[in-house]
């Protein structure tokens, strides 16, 4: 069974990762030495706890973004994703099929002037079977 990590350990590990991400890795012993060099940690026990949590977070960061930690590389990647513009606009198609409700919404948003809209009746959803037997 694991132990609960204190606020001090978590905060220190996050700050260390944000500032010294390039010097850290997945190895506890190297992370321990880096923590020892860059921070004034009062006890050996606390240093080991921080280094252990740094190692844990580094493994999580490799799998994907971690909440509460902003790293320059991840920030740039997020910017690229947010600023993505498709090659061909969805509005440049010859005919855009929409249902009557969507047509009304487009009219309210001042897109009613689109000439290539074609109103079609929506297809009825799938026929789900009613449950049999006692409920």
From Swiss-Prot:
Which SUPFAM superfamilies does the record associate with it?
Rps17e-like
Cross-link Glycyl lysine isopeptide (Lys-Gly) (interchain with G-Cter in SUMO2) maps to 103
- Pfam families listed in its UniProt record: Ribosomal_S17e
Q: Which residues carry this modification: N6-succinyllysine?
A: 19
Cell compartment(s), UniProt: Cytoplasm; Nucleus, Nucleolus
Q: Does the keyword Metal-binding apply?
A: no
Q: Which GO terms describe its molecular function?
A: RNA binding; structural constituent of ribosome
Choose one Gene Ontology CC annotation of this protein and give it. Answer: cytosolic small ribosomal subunit
Could you state what the record's PTM comment says about this protein? Ubiquitinated at Lys-103 by RNF14 and RNF25 in response to ribosome collisions (ribosome stalling).
Annotated Gene3D superfamilies: Ribosomal protein S17e-like (1.10.60.20)
| The entry's keywords | Cytoplasm, Diamond-Blackfan anemia, Isopeptide bond, Nucleus, Phosphoprotein, Ribonucleoprotein, Ribosomal protein, Ubl conjugation
Q: Which domain of life is it from?
A: Eukaryota
Q: Do you know which InterPro entries this protein is assigned to?
A: Ribosomal_eS17, Ribosomal_eS17_CS, Ribosomal_eS17_sf
Q: What does this protein's UniProt record list under function?
A: Component of the small ribosomal subunit. The ribosome is a large ribonucleoprotein complex responsible for the synthesis of proteins in the cell. Part of the small subunit (SSU) processome, first precursor of the small eukaryotic ribosomal subunit. During the assembly of the SSU processome in the nucleolus, many ribosome biogenesis factors, an RNA chaperone and ribosomal proteins associate with the nascent pre-rRNA and work in concert to generate RNA folding, modifications, rearrangements and cleavage as well as targeted degradation of pre-ribosomal RNA by the RNA exosome.
Q: Spell out the subunit comment.
A: Component of the small ribosomal subunit. Part of the small subunit (SSU) processome, composed of more than 70 proteins and the RNA chaperone small nucleolar RNA (snoRNA) U3.
Family classification: Belongs to the eukaryotic ribosomal protein eS17 family.
State what protein this is by name.
Small ribosomal subunit protein eS17
Organism of this sequence: Homo sapiens
Biological classification of the source? Eukaryota, Metazoa, Chordata, Craniata, Vertebrata
Q: Report the gene name.
A: RPS17
